[in-house]
């Protein structure tokens, strides 16, 4: 069987780089794409100059302003980013029809059998990066491997403007030293739990039996067992249509307080808005997910007359669904029982199957 050749291409600080390209006065300066510095908006993108101060995507703009008070804040121009993204996708399609765009600024290509009959994936990756720069004046990083998991990890290895190739025989040696927190599917809470179990790196994860991992992480334990060995059979899906998108947050401590939980719900709504904008997605059906301290799970949904994607609309709709889970205790509004996780997702009303990646960890 032919060894798969998968490329993951990820644009470097995409939104911020587009702004620095279009407005030369921003070049070389810490630039933050998002809302005003004194708002509850989150950072959509940060230039590498801003990242040196600790600014990261999804961070509240107010915190970013504290870390980098000299930074320039600009509002996102999503229509411009979408046009550039189309240019990038057109380049991908010159090599293969097996292109899976994950967002405006990144995608997978399966070039095992490609249109130009180029035998080496690394050659294609080099050509694509060169062509992207020629047509858009933007840089991209790329990773080459035999699976989605490996190629994505590889693309993150030498950013910005880097290329990393992981040969099949080198997969284990590549994974072993990496922190598990860098693995897709390992969020902050899971990474913390893994550390409590003595799992810090890919090698640590690989020493655990499948039974141990399932015991601690449920069915996700099987996934962790496989990726620690570089096993990922997911195909590049060129025709994938996203039906839903959301985010969830697991708390360090279970929560009862109404006001505290509303703040957490607002934070989730803000992150969902950012992801919806990045994926160019809107939907009519909002689903609220609540997991209690005893791991019991409740979901409630509401279908609206028009598609929504803004944080305030998500938040106000989620609150309506949230109210039934509260009661007045000793004159104070509290949850009916302690809550450990909140999630919000948005989907089309005709979605029959829930996207397995519907709720992504914050």
UniProtKB/Swiss-Prot annotation:
Annotated site location: Substrate discrimination: 15
MF-aspect GO terms: damaged DNA binding; DNA-directed DNA polymerase activity; magnesium ion binding
EC number: 2.7.7.7
Cofactor, how bound (note): Binds 2 magnesium ions per subunit.
Annotated localization: Cytoplasm
A single GO cellular-component term on record: cytoplasm
Residues noted as binding Mg(2+) in the record, renumbered to the chain: 10, 105
Chief subcellular location: cytoplasm
Family annotation (PROSITE patterns): UMUC
Names of the cofactor(s): Mg(2+)
Record-linked Gene3D superfamilies: 3.30.70.270, 3.40.1170.60, 5' to 3' exonuclease, C-terminal subdomain, DNA polymerase, Y-family, little finger domain
PANTHER family: DNA POLYMERASE KAPPA (PTHR11076:SF33), DNA REPAIR POLYMERASE UMUC / TRANSFERASE FAMILY MEMBER (PTHR11076)
Family to which the UniProt record says this protein belongs: Belongs to the DNA polymerase type-Y family.
Protein's name according to its UniProt entry: DNA polymerase IV
Taxonomic source organism: Leptospira interrogans serogroup Icterohaemorrhagiae serovar Lai (strain 56601)
Phylogenetic placement of the source organism: Bacteria, Pseudomonadati, Spirochaetota, Spirochaetia, Leptospirales
Chain's gene name: dinB
């Amino acid at each position: 069987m032919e060894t798969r050749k998968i490329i993951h291409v990820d644009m470097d600080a995409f939104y911020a780089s587009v702004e620095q390209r279009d407005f030369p006065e921003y070049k070389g300066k810490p630039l933050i794409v998002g809302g005003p510095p004194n708002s509850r908006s989150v950072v959509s993108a940060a230039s590498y100059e801003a990242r040196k101060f600790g600014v990261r995507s999804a961070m509240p703009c107010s915190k970013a302003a504290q870390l980098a008070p000299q930074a320039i804040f600009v509002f996102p121009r999503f229509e411009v980013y979408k046009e550039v993204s189309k240019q990038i996708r057109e380049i991908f399609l010159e090599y293969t029809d097996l292109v899976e765009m994950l967002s405006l600024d990144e995608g997978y290509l399966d070039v095992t059998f490609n249109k130009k009959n180029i035998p080496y994936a690394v050659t294609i990756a080099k050509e694509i990066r060169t062509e992207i720069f020629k047509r858009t004046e933007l840089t991209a990083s790329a990773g080459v491997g035999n699976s989605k998991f490996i190629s994505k990890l590889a693309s993150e290895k030498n950013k910005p403007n880097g290329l990393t190739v992981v040969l099949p025989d080198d997969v284990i040696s590549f994974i072993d030293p990496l922190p598990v927190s860098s693995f897709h599917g390992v969020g902050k809470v899971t990474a913390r739990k893994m550390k409590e179990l003595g799992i810090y790196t890919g090698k640590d994860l690989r020493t655990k039996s499948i039974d141990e991992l399932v015991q601690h992480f449920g069915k996700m334990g099987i996934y962790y067992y496989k990726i620690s060995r570089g096993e990922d059979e997911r195909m590049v899906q060129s025709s994938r249509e996203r039906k839903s998108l959301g985010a969830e947050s697991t708390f360090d401590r279970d929560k009862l307080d109404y006001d505290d939980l509303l703040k957490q719900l607002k934070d989730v709504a803000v992150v969902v808005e950012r992801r919806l904008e990045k994926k160019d997605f809107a939907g009519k059906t909002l689903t609220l997910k609540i997991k209690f301290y005893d791991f019991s799970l409740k979901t409630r949904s509401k279908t609206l007359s028009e598609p929504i994607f803004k944080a305030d609309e998500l938040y106000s709709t989620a609150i309506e669904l949230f109210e039934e889970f509260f009661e007045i205790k000793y004159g104070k509004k509290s949850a009916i029982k302690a809550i450990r996780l909140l999630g919000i997702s948005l989907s089309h009303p005709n979605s029959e199957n829930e996207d397995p990646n519907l709720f992504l960890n914050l």
